[in-house]
Amino acid sequence: MKTSFKMVAMLLGIGIFPLCAYAQQKVVIEDEEPNSIMFVSKNKAGDEIIRIMNDRSQMRFHDPNAPRFLLTDQKGKFALGLSLNVRATAEYDFNGIVNDVDFYPALIPQRGSGNFAKNQFQMDITTSTLFLKWVGRTKHLGDFVVYTAGNFRGDGKTFELQNAYAQFLGFTIGYSYGSFMDLSALPATIDFAGPNGSAFYRTTQLSYMCDKLKNWRFGVAMEMPSVDGTTNSDVSINTQRMPDFAASAQYNWNSNSHIKLGAIVRSMTYSSNVHDKAFSTTRFGLQASTTFNVTKKWQVFGQFNYGKGIGSYLNDLSTVSYTHLRAHETDSYL
């Protein structure tokens, strides 16, 4: 009986040993940084997953980093991350500039507006973000990303969608940042709104980015238009007939330095209540932006925008409908 028990124990030990040896073949990839990912994979596919998950080339400063914990398949070719990023800010205004949680110079009230309080204290937590990110790499699609995110900036501090898109083979399909933008040229700010005067908007789009040439990136996009303006009883803005078309070219000389040129062409449709007819007018926008490092700790950001009919795409101006053009054959403006 004792001999049989010993034999069974030896056989179990022999059976467990290969399993332990197999487990030792797994590679643990760990980063010491605060926003790192701990990932376990049987092969080098895990390296690719982490690279795709950490890519922030099409995100702004306030977008959350990759989640620390992921769900993966057995082969390490796909990963799903779900995370909640809680963000709170507090501010004190010593001169009563803007009665808003974000700083928009266009909202600075004129004297005699009825609010004579010069000091103001505010707190905000509505920019806390809940996001879901699914990444992977396949033979036919290459690197792909499916990303959805939202915060609580909706009416009454309700949940509001911020991003929902899929990326593969250079294409972006869904709701994301517009192509007439340069996210990398926007400096980091405590204020969620970001720098005024910069091109900043989100839209539903079909875009393509080509980075096959060394140091160069070229992009084209077809986007859902957003037309807004100041109207009167003779003019109204409703249905739009054509999408916006955007294009860009970017040259990079290192990972933190580039210069980018962009353009957008849009057809803006409005209805005349005088003529009982819809009219369209073509408008455009041009952009030049850059960011480069002077030293390791000194980064320069810059952006120049010029155009007609692009007020709804510019940060700050988009809050007050400052898109003006003369309506057809009338004295009205929109």
Please tell me what each predicted stretch does.
Residues 73-102, 113-227, 246, 250-253, ...:
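Outer membrane beta-barrel
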Residues 323-330:
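Conserved small/polar residues in nucleotide/adenosyl-binding loops
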Residues 239-289:
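Loop-centered beta-sheet repeat module
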